[in-house]
């Protein structure tokens, strides 16, 4: 099937989604209608016993002995039944998290065979240990809220630590209707995610970046910086492959001896040289940004900021994101 696609179109990359595996219904879904879900019986939930049967080890595959904090009530909801037995006798419970990984590997193997001279671009929602060697990732279905804008920074940090350096969140938010101000602030930050992409849920209000004048202007400014920094991003990706360091990283990675930055999840370093200090609150006109000791230079004006291991208040008008270059570093850029 993939070969048929690639024989007809020059596809640049692939996005493999819903590969947890995820489903719009629970159970066999035999009718093909999501509303016709298979009933969930109490004994499958561990809350009661079925008639004439006692609980046995099978129930552990439906109700694990530890909390996993899953979104849905039961671990088999909207996915492959965890008691399902594969053709080789393996129970789904034991291999569920490998589904996305194996799909990623199979897809990447095909792309390498089909175009051996090109590094494949693959985006996968489901990942596992080692996925960073195969695919890129986005943080899933977030919400169009100021809280999720803030949380996206820590999420990007997390996956960098997990070994997936090209990662990003849905810019402007996925679920729920965004606002002009939120979308402007999100693209100002999102332009510097390693993987930068806007995305929206079905039936939500349109949120293309050109919908509002202020968002369009914020986008032009932030994306112009990103495109200038593409050689630097590329260098950081290569460095990540060779050394293992994330592309987007918290300040504590570069300044581990400064206790004040241990829990700083409101700023983001791109590599070791570019500091992003976004506005993350509704109605903000300034941001308090932490500057480690040393020289830092405003990206736009080249004005020096003398870091002193303290916060400095920076102006943050709606269409502006604060970007600073670390003194003494070489940053390759393009026009």
Annotated model-derived regions:
Residues 1-334:
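Catalytic-domain carbohydrate-binding cleft regions of carbohydrate-active enzymes
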